[in-house]
């Protein structure tokens, strides 16, 4: 029922409508939706609900092609013109969710004579898959490993970009280096390269352009449960190299025969002297790149690259000629036998030449969709890199696209990381804030009777008062910081060159206090895993959850969260990193380049792992091996 009151204000009557509270509420909600008709809206009470269950009920998101500067949109699901599947060789390390499968296999251990049968088969051919199966069945579960340990984890160069040094040498002053430079221009001595030439001739016959239904495939292989590498060809005649495809960096690095270090000698190296299309970049430029575990030194060259059906000429890249380990740390390539890096991040990060490989590829071939996507198989064996669109077989539901905040990393804004239903960081009522406050309270000094001795009372009283004043100052400083924390934004960086997810340095201690490592063996592993919380990344109020079995790893009868400490420069905000094995394994990711003042986007969808996908990618891998 409506009531109408009239008031005389400056001799004018203004009707003021007063209604029941329910009608007012409905009216305000209606006005709110009118104002947000072109925007995304979500019921905040469902912020940590299962995204698949509530997606259709609580989301009204436009397509990206009709959306301009939206905080979120959905992918148009354009099919890819070029699909590059990645196939990984399974390693001895296993994920928590695969342990049950291993238990069944270990019930039937193989014996020595069975191992001999593998090597003495009629065709006299040794299959890597057979050897792996044999070793896996003989492996004891207590030695079951998953990914690399934190201290030996390979970090992509993106995490230490501020530490690299570029030394332009327009004039070569070092006589020793000048002599080496002149020698490299001479014709290569055939007597010392007969074996390498034979290998090159065989690789020239390798055709990795498997085109089927407008989809091009290039298998990738997994190394140490950490990195995914694929086959590319370099030079004329082509030499086959297996680099990492890294969304966390932009430069191309190839291990060359110029490198005589032990870690270089154990992998296949590119020989620039065998290629007629190779030339040095002008002006002659040396590069020193510092990683988390060492330094790579090299020189910039120009060469012809072939990735699947794409041939990119005059592409600048870095030739690795030396690897130096940091103090008390292992060498960059010591644990992982990759032969190079192909960066897929933005040009602003480039230090090897003028244009990136992806820019040259897109400008040369004019693909329908200026994007690529990554699919990581559930068991880390079968994976795929897709250029020019997406493959609907690898995901389900919509792909939710989020704008890149700064075109350097593939970096987006996100609301925060939640451990179960509590925000981890930052701001009031977050886990980090509560733990820091608790630590401050525990550090207070309290009087005890031992301090009340007559001869020491004044001294200890003075010390106590000084400590108390100092503590009060800290509290004021903490309250001042609290206001800053509320304004601090959180960011996510998508990095396919890193395996584990990361937490900033100042928060990693608190993270492991809430999600600690626990002892687990075959008798209690299910109980231990179920005791861990869910971890949820909330992006524009949309939750993307990792269950304990998805983010835990097992090593030496210990269950550990697959997280590590990586500190990103403050220039790029309060940033967390999502890696290939802990996040991308369960979520299909899309990377779209912006143009004409349109933002770049990162897309996320729930990954689908089926036997059909494995068979499809496995068949492509077998075709590559048989060529």
Curated annotation (Swiss-Prot):
InterPro entries named in the record: Aspartic_peptidase_A1 (IPR001461), Pepsin-like_dom (IPR034164), PEPTIDASE_A1 (IPR033121), Peptidase_aspartic_dom_sf (IPR021109)
Chief localization: membrane
TM stretches of this protein: 14-34
Location of the active site: 246, 495
Subcellular location: Membrane; Cytoplasmic vesicle, Secretory vesicle, Rhoptry
EC number: 3.4.23.-
Pfam families noted in UniProt: Asp
Residues of the signal peptide: none
Single GO term (MF): aspartic-type endopeptidase activity
UniProt PTM comment: Autocleaved into a p55 mature form.
Source species, domain of life: Eukaryota
Lumenal topological segments: 35-627
Knockout-associated phenotype: Normal asexual development in host erythrocytes. Egress from erythrocytes is normal; however, subsequent erythrocyte invasion by newly released merozoites is severely impaired. Accumulation of RAP1 p86 precursor resulting from impaired processing. Impaired ASP processing. Impaired secretion of CyRPA during merozoite egress from erythrocytes.
Gene Ontology biological-process annotations: entry into host cell by a symbiont-containing vacuole; protein autoprocessing; protein processing; proteolysis
Regulation (activators, inhibitors): Inhibited by small molecule 49c. Inhibited by small molecule WM382.
GO cellular component: cytoplasmic vesicle; lysosome; membrane; rhoptry
Domain spans labelled Peptidase A1: 228-605
Segments in the Cytoplasmic topological domain: 1-13
Enzymatic class: hydrolase
Membrane topology: Single-pass type II membrane protein
Function in brief: During the asexual blood stage, initiates the proteolytic maturation of several rhoptry proteins and thus, is required for merozoite invasion of host erythrocytes and probably the subsequent development of the ring-stage. Cleaves rhoptry associated protein 1 RAP1 and apical sushi protein ASP during schizont maturation. Also cleaves rhoptry protein RON3.
Family: Belongs to the peptidase A1 family.
Name the record gives this protein: Plasmepsin IX
Organism from which the protein derives: Plasmodium falciparum (isolate 3D7)
Gene responsible for this protein: PMIX
